[in-house]
């Protein structure tokens, strides 16, 4: 034990950086059947072929904005872990209140 307590904050914070896998084109991981299932849940019967790429684009923009706001809340609280409450507050800020995850 280094005597710094829980969290490891303090001296020696800037260690070696880990290699991060370069992420590209992960939006294609949202498959055609997955989009189809979401549409079915929303009551859609028939789906045009052009919908899939459009849906991926819209979903990407939505997630980027929610994640950006969530990370902002996390950084302000001087944490490194994004909590469910950070996401709830980010959604609330965008006018999409979510119940059932605290607060």
Curated annotation (Swiss-Prot):
GO terms for cellular component: nucleosome; nucleus. The keyword Acetylation applies. Residues 1-20 are annotated as: Disordered. Residues 17-21 bind DNA. The modification N6-acetyl-N6-methyllysine is found at residues 6, 13. One of its GO terms (biological process) is nucleosome assembly. InterPro entries: CENP-T/H4_C, Histone-fold, Histone_H4, Histone_H4_CS. Its main location: nucleus. It comes from the Eukaryota. It is found in: Nucleus; Chromosome. Residues 1-14 have a biased composition (Gly residues). PROSITE patterns: HISTONE_H4. The nucleosome is a histone octamer containing two molecules each of H2A, H2B, H3 and H4 assembled in one H3-H4 heterotetramer and two H2A-H2B heterodimers. The octamer wraps approximately 147 bp of DNA. Belongs to the histone H4 family. This is Histone H4. It comes from Mycosarcoma maydis (Corn smut fungus). The lineage of its organism: Eukaryota, Fungi, Dikarya, Basidiomycota, Ustilaginomycotina.
